[in-house]
Amino acid sequence: MKYTLEGSNARVIAKAVQSLSKVGKEMFIEIDQQSLQMRAINATQSAVGSISFKRSMFEVYDMPPHSDFYCKISMKGCLAVFRNMNEVEYCELNLLDNQTNLQVNLRCKLETTKEATISIIDDQNINTNINTDQMPNIIRGDHKLLTDISNNFNSSEEELTLEANSGSVVAKNYIEGARVNDKFMRTQLKLKPSEFEQYQVTKETVITFCIKEFRAFLLFAECLNASLTLEFDEAGMPFLLKIKKHGEIECLLIMSTLSPDDISFSEDYCQKDLTVQDEDVRAAAAKRKSSVSKPNVTNKRKGSSSEPAAVQPKRRVEETQLESSLDNPLFQFRDSEAPSVQHPRILAEVDTVVLIEDEAEQEALMLAAADAALEASMAPAPEPPNSTEVCFINTDDSQQPKPAKSSSDEDETIPQSPERPNKVLGVLLGLLQGCVSRLKTMLRLDEHLISGYELL
């Protein structure tokens, strides 16, 4: 099989290879009795590009009757061959070695020839089952207009959104209500139907598609100086881009659009939707209220004047039932208290304490005595008169007998005892005697009270 083209048509094929290289990394070639088709599919299988060249473009189109051929080759190898085509005057394509290699011969100016061989990876082809002739919305415009629309957005943009209705079409780089970065710059461009060659939008639609493949086919349309046709239906349905030139070259780009279920909306936008839904629910509830209350109004008019007072509470009950059905919370709490909480006890008159005046005076006296004892314990204890204490520290292990004390000291000092509790008791008795003597002078109490306290 042999196919030859002149230089200008060979440069068109080179442009087609460059455009398809931006879609996928592999090229699928299909040759039949009518045309030669080149296809490419992206890695995510969301876009398929196809460019068809009719048989009339070739000078020699040697194809066996009732036969076809298809294969898959590397896109990188095609780009290396179809490069710098300005000097090419003639191009020849041949299938060699039992259709396992594709040979490309390029004859350039000054009688120079380039020859390259591209190996065939597999005899594989791709097809689509999408009906490309029944789309409700069709927009056709010059390639310059669509190129200007594309140039208004940054080259780093990945998606383009079109909002089309009967009055205008808006192209923007964002989705209304979707989550975006705070530093993201939003851009939109609004066009009138008069700026297009054909504007047929019968169904208001908002679609989002990938802009990378769209720009790749815009470059090929600029090379052909041809118009582009956009055909689409609704979000989630395929988006078609078609290019035709003199009935010899046909291009078709099929891209998937973003479904509304795959969009991550922001919380504010979701809140707006919820408020709108709440308003719709409330409006429906109001309609139901009016439909329920109408029979009551007619009954009131037919009855006597005393009936409205009896019917009015029924209407309020019905309204509260409707509102409670709409505003019914997920959780219901009871007004009962927890069983572990005890009620506060109220003291009765029997539980109250009544103090007698004499007992109150005695209690005050005891408290004053305790305070005085505490102060005396904090202050340094006075030494008894005419007494001398001498402390001896025995460093020897042997115990020596203690000297006997004189009888005169027994009345003035408290005898020492080896038992510590008796010593502490003696100190406390001495402190109490000192407190009593002080209370006699300060408080000037009666003699019978003081004598009773000494007896204690």
Swiss-Prot record:
Any one Gene Ontology cellular component term annotated for this protein: checkpoint clamp complex
Nuclear localization signal, short sequence motif: residues: 300-302
CDD domains for the chain: PCNA
Pfam families in alphabetical order: Rad9 (PF04139)
Tissues expressing this chain: Expressed in ovary.
Keyword annotations: Nucleus
A GO biological process held by the record: DNA replication checkpoint signaling
Residues spanning the signal sequence: none
Coiled coil ranges: none
Quaternary structure, from the entry: Component of the 9-1-1 checkpoint clamp complex consisting of Rad9 isoform A, Rad1 and Hus1-like; the interaction with Hus1-like is direct. Does not interact directly with Rad1; this interaction is probably mediated by Hus1-like. This complex probably also forms with Rad9 isoform B, however 9-1-1 complex containing Rad9 isoform A localizes to the nuclear periphery. Interacts with Brca2.
Entry similarity comment: Belongs to the rad9 family.
Function comment: Component of the Rad9-Rad1-Hus1 (9-1-1) checkpoint clamp complex.
Protein name, as recorded: Cell cycle checkpoint control protein Rad9
Organism: Drosophila melanogaster (Fruit fly)
Gene: Rad9
